[in-house]
Amino acid sequence: MKKRLVNILAAAAALAVIIIAVLLCGCAQKDGYEKCAEDFFNALQAKDYDAIYDMMTPSSQSSISREKLKEYYDKVYSALEVTGIEASEFERVNQDRDAVFNYSLKLTSQSCGELSFDSSVTVRALLGFYLVEWTPGNVVPGMDYYDTVQVRTLRGIRGEIFDSSGAVLVKNAYAVTVYFNLNKTADFAASAQALAGILELDADALAQSMTKAAAGGNDTVVAAVYVPGALEAEKEERALAVDGVRVDRSSITPIRQAVYGSAAAHLIGYSTPVTKEDRSNEKYAGLSEGTRVGRIGAEYIYDDILRGTDGVEIVLRSADGSRRTVLYRKEATAGQDVVLTIDIGLQLEAESLMQEKYSQNKSTGAVIVNDPKSGRIKAMASYPTFDLNLYAAPAAAKGAADLIKNEALPLLNRATQGLYPPGSVYKTVSAIAGLETGTVRVDTAFPYEDEIVKVTDKTDGWRPKGSQWSHMIIREHMKSSASYGKLDMKRALVFSDNIYFGWMGMKVGAKDMIAWSERLGIGEQIPFELSVKKSQISNDPENAKLYKNDKFLADTAVGHGELLITPLQLSAIFSLYGNSGSIMQPYCVESICTTDELGRHTAVSVTKEQAYKEQVCSNATVEKISACLEKVTVDGTAKAANVKGMTLVAKTGTAQKNDTEEIGWMAGYIREGGEHYSLLVCVDGPKNGTGAIKTSVAKGLFTYLKDEAQS
């Protein structure tokens, strides 16, 4: 009797569930299958998991509780970052009592985009009512009750950076990672202490990391990361003798390795992993954790090109963790490579010379070598520099923070961001203005030589008659200059005579001096891939002071006054002497390309050469001034930079910053004896301390280029 009563109660309970489900589902005899399926799809799209549970068959409900069902959906859709669900295109595919409906399930995922699956649901008729035979496959097709969903980001490989010859400058690699295998480490504290003594680490912090990792079920703790070649073999051998220590070179720590360390650091730039703060910016909002983004230099300017597009793989894993099936896979797309115009050999030579010479008196500055006929930058160095490999690993090295505090500003690209008075290199601009306006000829002599007076043992001075100037125009006294005869333009250029060019600037007049300076681009921001500071003729955009004050006009004509210019722009202007009077637009990226497994580049785009200022003066003027400048390294201010077997068009300059500091310049163009490149050396250093540096660096580079041409 009791057994019969239990059966009756069980049947009644089942019937009650069915009746409730029917009432909630609204499934009637007429087209009940379709109506029930439709209600299921609507509940799914609304994420109404209570409604789904209420329309499930008793057998489905016996396999999972209401709370577990909600948890199941939430866990899976949370893993997939689902923000929207759409069930559409449903169609009954049989006429059996258990009706099967095929449908398209579309999940909108924040990380994966739109995921589409072909799915199906079974509607069963029970006692004339219609209920859903629910399975985990209705969450994601193919799932079983104990399966888990794993979403794995497929990292889009960042493009690499090469020099003009194809030498790799920045590549994707793996660090030398020193780590502890905790399963093989008997005494955490003792091993941490031993390794810390070898690699100069914090033993206490390391031991704490090991203890914390072990408590969390992890068996690996990274102790130190090194760029390949940085860990000494002797230290590695000693480290491996410590209990539990292992060394990995191929899988643990991916890095962005700068093959030549600090070489071309400001031009190449660096990248670091995207931060939470970055992702608040729309530009980086969709990037996955760990994706590198460029911060400065070419890494920043060409970030969108270098950065690959991440893919995604969604995998079903069984209860034992084994991979059961791939639900979805979108392949990653590698970034494209960037080929720079620089020659790494020349770049290394420039930086070696700067390190040797500039460090002697803590000078700073820049060196640029370019091709006057194309605008290609063949070398660009800023001193002091920094090691790009400080940013190679996912976490920046300790020394990276010190760069920001360093008073020498090693992160500053002085070639493009340093604004300096051009000094006497500007006399080559004034000479163009004088000749092109017809104010003087090369042989036009200064008419007031008898008014020049001796000021000191090393300087002479001149003040126009009737002038109210409180100071004279001062020049350095060079006894050897007298051998050139009268004080004309040739003598004035060779020996950098301030008196001649101050006088000539006044004769040309403010209007034409300004016009010719502007014609050469001064007062503009010269176009370049990297950001460049805008040059100026004076602090006043209208340059009114040049009209009102002859002394200021004369000072400007010799390269002082309030003139400011970047080394990049001054090098471009001087390059007109190697290009028949045209200034080419400088550029540092040769091409964007893809690279195959054999290292062969296929260009996607190539930078086209273009003039920045076409034919700013006649070729006749260029030849006249060049003939004068050829004597600068023979008899004049740059004799120390002369290289036997080379014909050089050159000009030096010095500009006083204050009573204790000056800017030293040397610009030169190789006319014969080497590749027809133009170079510029800028030295920001102590007073009377830049002359030997600028000429020795220039001579070293000229010699290198001569040897390269002959090899």
Report residues per predicted region.
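Small/polar-residue-rich segments within soluble enzyme cores
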Residues: 102-125, 129-143, 149-155, 167-201, ...
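Conserved, well-ordered alpha-helix/loop/beta-strand core segments that scaffold catalytic motifs
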Residues: 323-365
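Beta-lactam-recognizing serine transpeptidase/beta-lactamase-like catalytic domain environment
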Residues: 317-327, 342, 365, 370-424, ...
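Short solvent-exposed beta->alpha transition segments
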Residues: 28-38, 50-100
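Short, low-complexity N-terminal intrinsically disordered segments enriched in polar/charged residues
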Residues: 18-42, 46
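Short, glycine-anchored, charge-dense loop/turn motifs used at functional sites
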Residues: 161-171, 350, 367-378
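Second-shell loop/turn segments in exported
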Residues: 38-41, 55-60, 107-110, 148-152, ...
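N-terminal Sec-pathway targeting helices
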Residues: 2-13, 26
